[in-house]
A protein has these predicted regions:
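Active-site and donor-binding regions of nucleotide-sugar-utilizing enzymes
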Residues: 36-194
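Membrane-proximal basic amphipathic "stem/tether" segments
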Residues: 1-36, 145-156, 160, 169
Length: 194
């Protein structure tokens, strides 16, 4: 299993900035449909996104399409075996579904769906644990870029980028009022969204 580092992850994001810009432009003329929700999880079918998918399917009208966006062919097969409407998140279909969906449910980040088409969607960030450690803006490790020096200007630019991305989160449910301030601080969110 590959290990994740923020330095490498941030480097990939910096290199993909043109794709983020093109994706953001593509979202401008598109009307998002309240009859389309997309779901994804950074570790595959599961986490909080799967129970929410099932609850939404049990309570929303059939006219609302719920789609699991899979990160691999194996995940796609698992999702379909579980009876979920599923597509690959990368590629044109995943981009178009994310682009048109009003609600985007994620557990790790925007990359759980198609990261380039999230602007303008209502992102529900379910996260994937209890924030006992420092996260995102509160952790110096988060603000590093592997191919750039660990300099205050680099960290400031990354912090600004993380704050900007955090503004794309519409709702961040937490387990208790005790952890809410950590999430507000870590993601640069207004308390009203947590």
């Amino acid at each position: 299993m590959a290990s994740f580092t923020f330095g490498a992850g941030n480097a990939r994001k910096v290199l993909r900035l043109p794709l983020y810009a093109l994706g953001a432009l593509a979202t401008l003329p598109v009307r998002r449909s309240p009859r389309l929700w997309v779901f994804g999880s950074g570790i595959g079918v599961g986490e909080g996104a799967l129970p929410l998918y099932r609850h939404a399917r049990a309570t929303l009208p059939e006219s609302v399409r719920l789609v699991w966006l899979a990160g691999s062919p194996a995940e796609l097969e698992i999702a379909r075996t579980l009876g979920l409407d599923a597509e690959m998140r990368s590629g044109w279909r995943g981009f178009r579904l994310t682009l048109r969906a009003r609600v985007l449910v994620v557990t790790h980040g925007f990359g759980d769906v198609n990261r380039f088409a999230t602007r303008g969607g209502f992102v529900v960030q379910l996260w994937h644990g209890i924030p006992l450690k420092r996260l995102h803006l509160d952790s110096p490790a988060t603000l590093r870029v592997s191919f750039l020096p660990n300099h205050r200007l680099v960290r400031a630019a990354m912090a600004r980028a993380y704050r900007f991305a955090g503004q794309g989160i519409g709702l961040f449910p937490v387990a208790s009022a005790l952890v809410a301030p950590r999430i507000v601080s870590a993601f640069g969110l207004p308390a009203s969204r947590v």
